[in-house]
Amino acid sequence: MGITISGFRRKCSAFFAGSVHNYSERSRNISMNNYSNKKFNNSKKSPRGTGHRPGYGAKPDRRPGGDRRPGGDMPAVAPENIVSGRNSVRELLKSGRSVDKIFVRTGDREGSITVIVAEAIRLGIPVIEVDGSKLDAMTCGAHHQGVAAMAAEKQYVDLETIVNIAHERGEKPLVVVCDGIEDPHNLGAVIRCAECAGAHGIVLPKRHAVGLTPVVTSASAGALEHMAVAKVQNIAAAVEKLKELGLWIFTAEAGGTPYYETDWNCGAAVVMGSEGQGVSRLVREKSDFIVSIPMYGKVNSLNVSTAASVILCHAARMQRT
């Protein structure tokens, strides 16, 4: 069958028009499919980076040991304005030091706690009941016996004040110098021994030693409230100053003269060294006497607080005779 030129042109136009239409439809469908696939794939993508990202407002995980709040995984620095333990709080209330609050463990209202609460109420001091866990955190692990107090920090004195306390009492000065004692239980026990022996003051270094923490106050059983305390920059310089004030320096060290063969009829400063290192070389060189406690058993050393009690009680008796 023949076809005219005009007919051929019409068929070609129709063919190309259909092809263009089909191509456009296919292109549109492919574009839509790609868009859908891209959108779908994006919904499965993880956030940028390989680690877990907390949501908005979430707190980041702390590194181990990074929590420094009371009760966290790292103990807080022990404050010096917290007094813990029944005897310590009772003596605190007698001492005249300003007390802000008394904290009592919930349910503990018997024995000496009752006396403490009654005295606090009489003095107008708020008494607050708290959980035992809060007391533990507040006292940084001290043996608080269900009670603690928030008080003004103990006021430190200078060396001259300690010596003047002895003169005002008409007594020969007896001062305890703690050269780097780091264990709070030991320091608390030394303070307790010193007060019982009638010592007039304690000298502590500002660095490389424990401060007057809740554990120290608890271990002192209230003796700290009746003891003058000087905190010095340098123990060796403090020893030199005490010598200028008329005191003789007695350092407790192994290998010295037995303490009972030494003349204590004078103003005396007794130096007790740290648990591990003992007395520093410079302090030893500045000492007038090196005294020791003879050992007759198989163990060749005493706890620093035990040694202090032996020497201080002997020194106090000899000063008074």
Language-model features, listed with the residues they occupy:
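Extreme N-terminal basic, low-complexity initiation segments
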Residues: G2-F8
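N-terminal positively charged helical leader segments and presequences
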Residues: F8, F16, V20-I165
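Structured adenosyl-cofactor binding patch, chiefly the S-adenosyl-L-methionine
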Residues: R90, S95, C196, P214-A223, ...
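RNA substrate-binding interface of SAM-dependent RNA methyltransferases
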Residues: K94-R97, H167-T257
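Short beta->alpha connector loops at strand-helix junctions that form conserved
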Residues: D131, A152, D179, P205-K206, ...
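Active-site/ligand-binding-proximal alpha/beta "capping" segment
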Residues: F250-N303
